[in-house]
């Protein structure tokens, strides 16, 4: 008898959750076991009615009461304990970790400790605690499969996923669209509005990640992810601006061979690849018509995109705590920008100041990760007044 793969989707109402559920709708291979959401209870209720999960998780009791008034036949859990439970239950085969921000850290670790197949879209798990998460994955024989289009592309380009091929890799090249301001100089961006920063030319994404793409913070975080996912030193990671977002990443091998993964910009492709791995599943995506594209590439200038400069410096110095500071400061500053409390260029300007002024030892456990994160946010709040 055919047994469907049971999946928990952390962050079901976000853009990655949308694409994951779109893949599930197109196939008959997956059973939604649990769904979680932070604020959009109405959308979560609709998804519960459609997919009939056993569990749903919301952040607090008021949202639990609201969800229970909208749906029946689903057990509603609350808070961090609920997230960790639905990430580690014995019945679950796959956990899609798509919560935005450091809130995704604990449930991702819970999934790793339970030996789950983790589809990782939550950048912060690797950005803030990469050394700790990789240890948990190895120790508990879990699987960590990247969902970001760039890292999933690298994953597909590496022909031996047990990492025995890593000495053969000469360079991992991440591509970046460059965002909506890729052709503008910094002095032209003084009056950028949140609406302009969120208007990504290629991808449909949430507001926070759209701003991160425009500042190249998103790519800087992806550099950190690649560092941990593929066990390579910082000098073996490069970034190219590729406006068409067709070539998702490139791997250069020591014999001079280059292997790239290409496709139209559609998150269903990397998500389906991760969900079905080690096999491939059929999903509805637009075919890539090579005759319609002229692919272009250029170097990502560190002076123009200073987020990259900050992160590469942190990695070269093995200052992993500084990456926690960088990430926490960015989250606070992007929120301030979206709420029109600071100007666009201050996102990076203030982050440079904060990352330089705060110094912590590398964390030995996730409690220390959260402590560094908390102190950084408090410091940013004091700087912003």
UniProtKB/Swiss-Prot annotation:
GO terms for biological process: isopentenyl diphosphate biosynthetic process, methylerythritol 4-phosphate pathway involved in terpenoid biosynthetic process. 1-deoxy-D-xylulose 5-phosphate binds at residues 123, 149-150, 177, 200, 213, 218-219, 222. It catalyses: 2-C-methyl-D-erythritol 4-phosphate + NADP(+) = 1-deoxy-D-xylulose 5-phosphate + NADPH + H(+). SUPFAM superfamilies: 1-deoxy-D-xylulose-5-phosphate reductoisomerase, C-terminal domain, Glyceraldehyde-3-phosphate dehydrogenase-like, C-terminal domain, NAD(P)-binding Rossmann-fold domains. One of its GO terms (molecular function) is 1-deoxy-D-xylulose-5-phosphate reductoisomerase activity. Its EC number is 1.1.1.267. Keywords: Isoprene biosynthesis, Manganese, Metal-binding, NADP, Oxidoreductase. Its cofactor is Mg(2+); Mn(2+). Belongs to the DXR family. This is 1-deoxy-D-xylulose 5-phosphate reductoisomerase. The lineage of its organism: Bacteria, Pseudomonadati, Pseudomonadota, Gammaproteobacteria, Thiotrichales. The gene is dxr.
């Amino acid at each position: 008898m055919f047994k469907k793969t049971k999946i928990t989707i952390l962050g079901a109402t976000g853009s990655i959750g949308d694409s994951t559920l779109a893949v599930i709708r197109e196939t008959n291979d997956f059973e939604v076991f649990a769904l979680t959401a932070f604020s959009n209870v109405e959308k979560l209720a609709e998804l519960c009615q459609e997919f009939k999960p056993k569990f749903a998780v919301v952040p607090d009791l008021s949202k639990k009461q609201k969800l229970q008034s909208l749906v029946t036949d689903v057990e509603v859990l609350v808070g961090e304990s609920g997230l960790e439970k639905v990430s580690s239950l014995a019945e679950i085969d796959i956990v899609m970790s798509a919560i935005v921000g450091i809130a995704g850290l604990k449930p991702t670790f819970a999934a790793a400790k339970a030996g789950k197949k983790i589809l990782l879209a939550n950048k912060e798990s690797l950005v803030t605690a990469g050394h700790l998460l990789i240890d948990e994955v190895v120790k508990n024989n879990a699987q960590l499969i990247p969902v970001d289009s760039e890292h999933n592309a690298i994953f597909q380009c590496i022909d031996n996923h047990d990492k025995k091929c890593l000495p053969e890799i000469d360079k991992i090249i991440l591509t970046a669209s460059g965002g909506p301001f890729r052709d503008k100089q910094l002095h032209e961006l003084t009056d950028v509005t949140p609406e302009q920063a969120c208007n990504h030319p290629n991808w449909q994404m949430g507001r926070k990640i759209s701003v991160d793409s425009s500042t190249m913070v998103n790519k800087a975080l992806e550099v950190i992810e690649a560092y941990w996912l593929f066990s390579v030193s910082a000098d073996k990671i490069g970034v190219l601006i590729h406006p068409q977002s067709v070539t998702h990443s490139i791997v250069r091998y020591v014999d001079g061979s280059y292997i790239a993964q290409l496709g139209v910009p559609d998150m269903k492709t990397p998500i389906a690849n991760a969900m079905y791995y080690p096999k491939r599943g059929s999903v509805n995506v637009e075919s890539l018509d090579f005759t319609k594209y002229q692919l272009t590439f250029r170097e990502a200038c560190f002076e123009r995109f200073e987020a990259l400069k900050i992160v590469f410096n942190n990695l070269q110095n093995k200052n992993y705590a500084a990456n926690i500071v960088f990430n926490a400061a960015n989250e606070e500053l992007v929120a301030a920008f979206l709420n029109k409390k600071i100007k666009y260029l201050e996102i990076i300007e203030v982050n440079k100041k904060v990352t330089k002024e705060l110094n912590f030892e590398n964390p030995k456990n996730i409690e220390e990760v959260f402590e560094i994160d908390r102190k950084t946010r408090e410091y940013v709040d004091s700087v912003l007044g």
